[in-house]
Amino acid sequence: MKRGKVMKKKSRFLTGLLSAALALSLCAMPAMAADNGETITSTINTAQKGSLTINKYEGDKQDPEKLLDGVTFTAYKVADIVQSTEAGTTDVKMQPVEALTKIKSDIQITSETKYDDIKDTVDAALAEDANPKLTAFATATTGDNGITGQAVFSEMPVGVYLIVETGAPSQIVNKTANFLVSIPMAKEDGTGWNYDIVANPKNAAVYGGISLKKYGKNYNPDGTFSEVALSGATFYLQRKEGDDWVTVTAPTVSDSNGSVDASGLLTTSANGMINITDLAPGTYRFIEYSAPQGYIMDGQAAYEFTINNDQTVTISDAYKDTLANTIKVVNEKPSMEKQVKTGVDAYGKATDASVGDVVTWKVTAAVPSNVNKLAKYILTDTMSSALTWESETEANLTIETNPNVKLDKDTDYTLTVPEDGTEGGTWTIEFTTAGKEKLAANNVTSISVTFNTRLNKNATVNKEGNLNDASLTYSNGFKSNDEEYPTQPDPKDEVIKNEASVYTFGMNIEKVDGKDSRGKLQGAEFDLYLYNGSETNPTEAELKNNGVKVGHYTTDVYGEIHVSGLKNGTYYLVETKAPTYNVVENGETKTYSYNLLKEPVKVVVNVQYEVDTKTTITTDANGNVTTNKIESKKYVGGENDSGNYKVIIKNNKGFNLPTTGGFGTLLFSGIGVLLVVAGVGVLLSLKKKNRT
């Protein structure tokens, strides 16, 4: 009977303790005993140490893909398990620790106790002024043991422990509720004890997203611009952790909106987007690493934003896009154009001129708003040998800005020019630090430089014309010296080259015998005039008054004159001396002159030309070079569309007659016919009178 009573008491104890252990473990989150095959006994081995393994999941499911590192738990021992045996009966009690009984002497922890029942007492025992204070047994952080999402407390003496989640990543907005766990716990079948406990608490996690859209601000030379979505720009994403910024090496990026490499470098997609999801609440920033060719990379800007606990995003108005939750980042791309004066107030890509004419050129360049941060902003002009730099005075190089700002030579810029009288040569305008600051401070959007050259004898006649090219050299970015920024590449040079052209044309004059064109007439002399008047058949006097004498020329042994360096216009050749020829009469050689042309010979030079610009981009060790080279689109005029006009002039012997086939010949023949008719009429009239 006695033995039976003892067994009944033990059984009641086992059932009660099992219930207590399960109740304690179920106060907040489930815990279970790990079946490690230990020998089952009906009493607790109070000298044995146990362990608590916590597997931490995000959300409310035990999803292996959602194991969470970085969660810290703290264990506080709140009760000892005390065993006593009397008369063969084992009695087990949960005895609260002194830190709790000092606060509340009658505190009890039983199988029915929940954490909320002892919360106030625990809070008081954790206060700084508590004496004694409830101290932590140990802390453990998931992932620290090398297993994702797992934290382990080991060497835990037998007792009841309060488990508190004391640290978690920012996406965890609702921490695991505090829970109690006993070491050991009864096995589920009630047959014994397990000292190695497993708990699987869960959290409510919150994530947010952010988008970045990259725009290219493409400047026209006059400072106007358009914005386009810009692909191929790269960024790093950093997260603020305490006082430090740490690069996010594996952000989650939408496949269609950006890409990321193994280092965490993000690249904008074809639509200029980077779309990042699954960001835990916290403060972040984008740092630009590189910009596409031609664009200026702003490596000093930090595009900061905050993912809030309610999943909203806070973005500074300074770079907030019109798209929701989107940061707007703009890269600027300057441009430059070379032009030549084509009219009173007109400029274009090509004009025509005569040798000796003044040709005025214009270089126009866009000024980026961040020009003051660039190491270089330089304008250069290179003239062909067909262009003479007469002097700085004659060149009258003038710099204008929009809006108008006075720039001081040697303070705001330096100017180097060719020596006076140089055929060809280069001038350079390099803006100083002070000059770049002045441009930025005054919001200057464009610069134009005009200057004069003179077309010289080196001018050639061809469909490419005589080129003059300009270039703009600027730095393609500026980086930060902040040590917490990702290491950025050093800026390189971007060079834009642009051409304009001046055309000139020619005449090939051939003097031949009026009856035999094989006879080439040497020694004929002509004056060539460019006529600007309104007379249909101007006389030599009219040409002298309202024309410009181009030159005086004499036919060579082949009867030819070659004239080049002519612009489009109406020209007249005035013969001032006719060629001569020899005749042997009665054994004696006599010299006679051909007839001198009675009126000027008209020659219209009208070459129609158009040019296109072909752009090529090359890259070298110093940076990128964009060349905008002129290509002929249309070039029509002259013999075989060469720009050279062929003029054949015939001279007759014997009388001072006009050129064969010319209007003068027709007039002379007409007068002769009229005289013959008149003579016949007179004879008929006389005969009639005689009859009467």
Residue ranges with predicted function:
Residues 2-692:
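Solvent-exposed loop/turn and edge beta-strand elements of beta-rich ligand-binding domains
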